[in-house]
Design a protein with these regions (language model features):
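Compositionally biased, charge-rich terminal segments
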Residues: 1-8
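Nucleotide-sugar donor-binding catalytic core of glycosyltransferases
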Residues: 15-122, 130, 138-147, 170-270
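Active-site proximal beta-strand in glycosyltransferases
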Residues: 152-168
Length: 270
């Protein structure tokens, strides 16, 4: 068998195995959700839960909030998350990457613990100096330990967890009993924002308060432009999950797809 054919078969087998794992995970959470008699919270339930949880806090006008944001700018976050948050107030932003590179193979053994300590110390200093209204994070279990999130929670500032693609990554890989996704950290946040509707039950089972907000687009950036069309279909996003298999199938059906982002032959757009 040629090497190229073997690689394709291996990728397809990996996709099949992951699909089975995700299906099993989905069914297990469905069963636990039903057996515990849980319910997905609606807007009124979320408001009541936050009111009871965040005693002593009062609403502020839009634009008047003091916000601490914790996330790494992979490629889109700085141009999307930060301007969106700034509509609600001032934003102080922590990105650990320059001091703690989390892309190395030995990240968990070498610098994860140090990064987590720095995160808690830095945010603690900012909280003491500024008394922010909210801490907004785009994190995962791969990046932070559950006890790190508990330490952040102890500062007494409302915390929001933002997560994308919980269909594949709510649990994700598990190393040393800890999930790379949101499973082990979500319960320590006051509110968990997920773009994956069928992950709501997973959050409830793990003791979190979830809200479903579907992915959208920033109309200031993503809008029709009068440009010559040179590509049948374009996709912009990192290469992972079922994306390669989806694009492979489209190409096999005669739909020419050009993909851009980390991991694709075309590379990122910026």
């Amino acid at each position: 068998m040629e090497e190229g054919s073997f690689k394709r078969l291996r990728k397809r087998f990996g996709h099949w195995r992951k699909t089975k794992r995700l299906r099993r995970e989905f069914l297990e959470y469905q069963a636990r959700f039903a057996s515990q008699g849980l319910a997905i919270p609606d807007d009124s339930s979320i408001r009541l839960a936050l009111k009871n949880r965040l005693t002593g806090f009062r609403p502020k006008p839009k634009g008047a909030l003091s916000i601490i944001a914790v996330y790494h700018n992979y490629n889109w976050e700085e141009g999307a998350l930060k301007p969106a948050l700034e509509k609600f107030g001032t934003v102080r932003y922590y990105d650990w990457f320059e001091a703690f590179d989390h892309t190395g193979r030995d990240w968990r053994r070498s610098v994860k613990a140090e990064m987590n300590r720095d995160l808690v110390v830095r945010i603690g200093q900012w909280v003491a100096a500024e008394r922010p209204d909210v801490i907004f994070t785009y994190l995962s279990g791969e990046l932070v330990f559950p006890e790190t999130v508990q330490a952040l929670r102890s500062f007494g500032v409302p915390m929001i967890h933002f997560s994308l693609n919980d269909k594949e990554h709510f649990v994700g890989k598990v190393r040393g009993g800890l999930a790379f996704g949101s499973r082990d950290i979500c319960r320590w946040f006051d509110l968990c924002w997920t773009s994956t509707e069928d992950a709501l039950k997973k959050y409830c089972v793990e003791g979190a308060l979830p809200v479903y907000l579907p992915e959208g687009a920033n109309p200031e950036l993503h809008r029709p432009r009068e440009l010559e069309k040179t590509t049948d279909v374009s996709f912009v996003g990192q290469r992972y999950g079922n994306r390669p298999e989806t694009i492979r199938r489209l190409n096999a059906e005669g739909v020419r797809v050009e993909a851009f982002g980390y991991g694709w032959p075309n590379g990122p757009l910026s």
